[in-house]
Amino acid sequence: MSARSIFKALVNCGFDVLTVGITKDGRWTLIQNPDTFFADGWKEVTQELGPLCYILPDPCRPGIWIDGHELEEAHNIDCSNPVITGGLDVDAVFPVLHGSFGEDGTIQGLLDLSGLPYVGSGTLASSVCMDKDTAKIILSHYGIPCVPYVRVERYEWRQKPIQVLEDLSSGLTFPVFVKPSGSGSSLGVSKVKGEEGLCRALEDAFLYDTKALIEPAQEGYLEIECAILGNNEPKASVPGQIVPSREFYDYEAKYIDENTRLIIPAALDDDLAESVKKISIEAFKATGCSGLARVDVFVNPRSRDIKVSEINTMPGFTEVSMYPKLWEASGMSYEDLVATLVDLAFERKTACHRAFRRVTKM
């Protein structure tokens, strides 16, 4: 759904857009009729939508490369045209991919090897922010307050579960949240109200990662999100508040339940809102982010305490998602936001290229 909204905005901004989808078995397909594909909402990407395509880890052969034999046999296209059998020129990539392989540094690493500019954070920042454990270690190093947690390794849990439970029970105050360290969209997250629910919650979390985090529920705190935009001098949007209709903001609440409320701007006084923006920018910089990120925090209006929960380097991006809605409330339209992100991709690529050239001359 994010891809459909971004595709429409890029076209309206005057960009020539090549649309690449990924099938469930991991094959990349150049979608030949994206207008038709996106017309009726979400659809599964299948190989029948277009020819197989590739991005090569070779800066001497940038762009999207297509298998000419596959074109000829499956789609009845004349492969005597060298443009079709070779590479299609690409100026920049907008990787609208959430979760594993999309915002964990994997696709970013491939794009770095290819030499193509791309929207969003680089390989290191993407991988750091995807792993909540690593991100919190870095944020704490810089003195940025985070939600406290206990880490559980899957191999330890498999070898000695009783010992792990005994160690945990002495230091936990329920309710707690159990979550995979490196997963998105609240997949594998459980709210646990007592010791009897820990085993099931840990098993669910370990379906998505080899590390699980256990965090105390932040009762009395508001769930606040802040959108960050920029590279070296990032700006923060007005903060927004999430009021889920469910017990917590799980996968269904994010993507299915229409009763979840987004309050923009959040019900915070001006000083507290500015503090949220300041901490969000600090978190963005500390983890080395660029382009965009949504920083999720917990705020206690009475004590004025602020704790960073996590940083999302490729947040949801439909017209009604929190990230673009926060910028809309801050005075930037959806199309201007998308165009700005493309500009930031070129800016980051130019800065990285100059730094590389300076080093090679030494």
What are these regions (language model features)?
Residues 117-121, 146, 236:
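Short hydrophobic/aromatic-enriched beta-strand-loop microsegments
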Residues 98-99, 186, 242-246, 312-326:
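Glycine-rich phosphate/pyrophosphate-binding beta-alpha loops
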Residues 190-278, 301-307:
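Phosphate-binding site of ATP-dependent enzymes
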Residues 1-4, 8, 14-17, 83-88, ...:
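Active-site nucleotide/adenylate-binding loops and adjacent lid/helix of ATP-dependent enzymes
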Residues 109-118, 194-199, 329-332:
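A glycine- and small-aliphatic-rich helix-loop capping segment at beta-alpha/alpha-beta transitions
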Residues 12, 269-362:
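ATP-dependent carboxylate activation and anion-phosphoryl transfer catalytic cores
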Residues 1-124, 128-130, 134, 153-164, ...:
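ATP-binding N-terminal substructure of ATP-dependent carboxylate-amine bond-forming enzymes
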